[in-house]
Amino acid sequence: MASGLPRFLQALPAEHGPEPLRTRVQEPDLQQWGLTGIRLRSYQLEGVNWLVQCFHCQNGCILGDEMGLGKTCQTIALLIYLVGRLNDEGPFLVLCPLSVLSNWKEEMERFAPGLSCVTYTGDKEERARLQQDLRQESGFHVLLTTYEICLKDASFLKSFSWSVLAVDEAHRLKNQSSLLHRTLSEFSAVFRLLLTGTPIQNSLRELYSLLCVVEPDLFCREQVEDFVQRYQDIEKESKSASELHRLLQPFLLRRVKAQVATELPKKTEVVVYHGMSALQKKYYKAILMKDLDAFENETAKKVKLQNILTQLRKCVDHPYLFDGVEPEPFEVGEHLIEASGKLHLLDRLLAFLYSGGHRVLLFSQMTHMLDILQDYMDYRGYSYERVDGSVRGEERHLAIKNFGNQPIFVFLLSTRAGGVGMNLTAADTVIFVDSDFNPQNDLQAAARAHRIGQNKSVKVIRLIGRDTVEEIVYRKAASKLQLTNMVIEGGHFTPGAQKPSAEADFQLSEILKFGLDKLLSSEGSSMEDIDLKSILGETKDGQWTPDALPAAAAAGGGSLEPEEGSELESRSYENHMYLFEGRDYSKEPSKEDRKSFEQLVNLQKTLLEKTSHGGRTLRNKGSVLIPGLAEGPIKRKKILSPEELEDRRKKRQEAAAKRKRLMEEKRKEKEEAEHRKKMAWWESNGYQSFCLSSEDSELEDLEGGDESSAELAYEDLDSTSINYVSGDVTHPQAGEEDAVIVHCVDDSGRWGRGGLFTALEVRSAEPRKIYELAGKMEDLSLGDVLLFPIDDKESRDKGQDLLALVVAQHRDRTNVLSGIKMAALEEGLKKIFLAAKKKKASVHLPRIGHATKGFNWYGTERLIRKHLATRGIPTYIYYFPRSKARHSQPASSSSAPLVP
């Protein structure tokens, strides 16, 4: 080819396509090299072989399988191949959103335990320590981190020569001007792999941006316009389409569930319409009239119009999203449900689903709407978990775990925070309270339930306000999704128009007028009850009946939407749900809509003129001047008397106290239910806990008298009540009495190495076995004490040696260990006192935390003295002797000489 052609054309492969691998990778090979805990499906094994081929051809690539088909496990299998077959020790860098970081870590541990994986997270100080460790010890295979930390510590990560750079949820890179895109282009990587369930969302430009990451030499930044211009008319030019297929074939693999996961249960989407309450209608009109200037010049007022659209969407969700609308004293009641047509429908929908034994993922765009839904869940007594953008990684993981392991009815999620990477197949019903402008976000959210591992049919229910902007937003999203499906199909890039459709030129000011004719036809509520069974279909034994389609979906207020990839999806939209009475509302507002809007505007202007001529000036033209509110004099805020203020204060206090009491009762009920479930689980596994009961220590607190007077008494006691000795605490210097050895552990259930951990393992096989089993059975909480004998290998002639493991440290999911938590240590010492008192035993401790920088030994010593020594328990603190080391007396115990 001529040298003047763009680089991507110079690298165009031959007509016959890429040469196949001489030797295919088989699953037994991967198992031999270290793959465990999974049986790859045939299409996943094909994907692994395709990735291997790309690696050998030195092509970066995009694995664009639909959400839920196992892109993570295919990537891990590739890394296993590189290490096991090619002896490529990496390092490999994996970038992903924070929301799926724990999932990546768990699947690395599960599928590739032979690969060492470092999770690079934490605050600045923690990451600095990790950087030092990684520089000193480079023997890791995989470094796992998030986009945000990659940007913060780009200079450190650039210092490595990565064998593989893998980016999960890679549609984050669709803009080649973004900081992350520019940063990753500076990384040194032999092979670049992008994972995304949505390889193209809007345009050829976005696709080129991804190609620019995987093969920057072929798809250079400067030639994006050449790419767009060459292929923008591929729908008309079959030669260009064929050329584009060949160009993309080495770089892009895309499979959808309908093609490869035929055993996956069916997914059906149903659109259910709802009316509006009178309160919602009132505010809907008021929002439209708040800023009339915005409708005069759309180009200049686009931001204002977008704000109006957002406010209208909030109004359709719930009027309480606006300050000052909810009536005082802010007590949850039926008014919360009746104020919103959407929540009125959702209330009946959830009751229907609950009685049928279904479990629900409930998505909303707005976290404030999730707040209202959370109040509603508490009011109705439904069990739920919640995840949104404010929920930290550890809490997010716990919520997902709880939903998977417990019969929780609803999982509340924000679409963008909860729509990425989560596996929530315990749910069989997905409800979208409102729709995203980008349909790919909704698709990803629905894929949390409809994915590999789901064994039930999935029903996706979308709630849309009738005759509101929600209708036109959803229609535009559906059109956008149809365009995307034309662009990429069956693993190839296929002909599809990339020019904006007619709707893209649709004026925003026109969107806001949609449906006004019918919406404003009456002032009253348009909410009504509908037959949910006829709309949603049959349900039996907690499962949707896959073969029974709803009989009255379209007629009864609902509309069936086809599953992605089905034949229905490619049909004409001529009979779409937006075609009412022969008029296509998806194209533009009707004449009646425009007429109703003009009437509103004229009325608003008349009211403004009357108010102005009446001698009053408006401080804010955005005042809510609508029929029913503007008639008569403007109502002033009532000035309350001191008695009325006091009465209101008391009512608010009573309401707050009642809410607090109800929340406490529900919390206790939930804890009791969880405890009963855990006891049943333990019994089914034959597990017996070694934890000391906390009831006796709580009783001891009640009987212990005045703490302050006790503290004063301790000051007068001789410090020799603690015996300081030199020796090995695992072989206590005891007489004929029982001896309790104390050791502090964390709540992870992973036994440590070195120091006292190793010494205890030499002494007995029980500590590691009992501690790790307690971790597996979720029997390790801060403040717990595991007490058990350790005389299995050696014993004294008289008296028994026991080990008390105090859970006093927390290890988070990124393997960061906290310091010793004094409250947990104190709780543990209380329990040890009662056990030692009953057994008439002595207590033997190492110098807890002596190697920890900044550890409060003085406070620890006081706790030991307070709860053990001064209460009659023989207490010994051991200093381990080391060669050529002289043991000096601790400053806090100057009168206690050490035994040499």
Swiss-Prot record:
Region of interest called Regulatory linker segment (RLS), as start-end residue ranges on this chain: 606-640
Chain positions with Phosphoserine modification: 534, 612, 623, 641, 894
Pfam family, one: SNF2-rel_dom
Catalytic activity: ATP + H2O = ADP + phosphate + H(+)
Matches recorded under PROSITE patterns: HELICASE_ATP_BIND_1, HELICASE_CTER, MACRO
Compositionally skewed regions (Basic and acidic residues) per UniProt: 653-673
GO molecular function annotation: ATP binding; ATP hydrolysis activity; ATP-dependent chromatin remodeler activity; DNA helicase activity; histone reader activity; nucleosome binding; nucleotide binding; poly-ADP-D-ribose modification-dependent protein binding
Protein family membership: Belongs to the SNF2/RAD54 helicase family.
SMART domains: DEXDc, HELICc
Disulfide cysteine pairs (residue numbers): none
Top-level class of the enzyme under EC nomenclature: hydrolase
Enzyme Commission designation: 3.6.4.-
Domain Macro: start-end pairs: 709-900
Function: ATP-dependent chromatin remodeler that mediates chromatin-remodeling following DNA damage. Recruited to DNA damage sites through interaction with poly-ADP-ribose: specifically recognizes and binds histones that are poly-ADP-ribosylated on serine residues in response to DNA damage. Poly-ADP-ribose-binding activates the ATP-dependent chromatin remodeler activity, thereby regulating chromatin during DNA repair. Catalyzes nucleosome sliding away from DNA breaks in an ATP-dependent manner. Chromatin remodeling activity promotes PARP2 removal from chromatin.
Coiled-coil regions listed in the entry: 643-680
Regulation of its function: Adopts an inactive conformation in absence of DNA damage. Binding to poly-ADP-ribosylated histones activates the ATP-dependent chromatin remodeler activity.
GO cellular component, one term: nucleoplasm
SUPFAM superfamilies listed in its UniProt record: Macro domain-like, P-loop containing nucleoside triphosphate hydrolases
Protein localization: Nucleus; Chromosome
Renumbered residue ranges of the record's region Disordered: 546-569, 641-673
Subunit structure, interactors included: Interacts with nucleosomes; interacts with the acidic patch of histones. Interacts (via macro domain) with PARP1; interacts only when PARP1 is poly-ADP-ribosylated (PARylated). Interacts with CIAO1.
Protein name stated in the entry: Chromodomain-helicase-DNA-binding protein 1-like
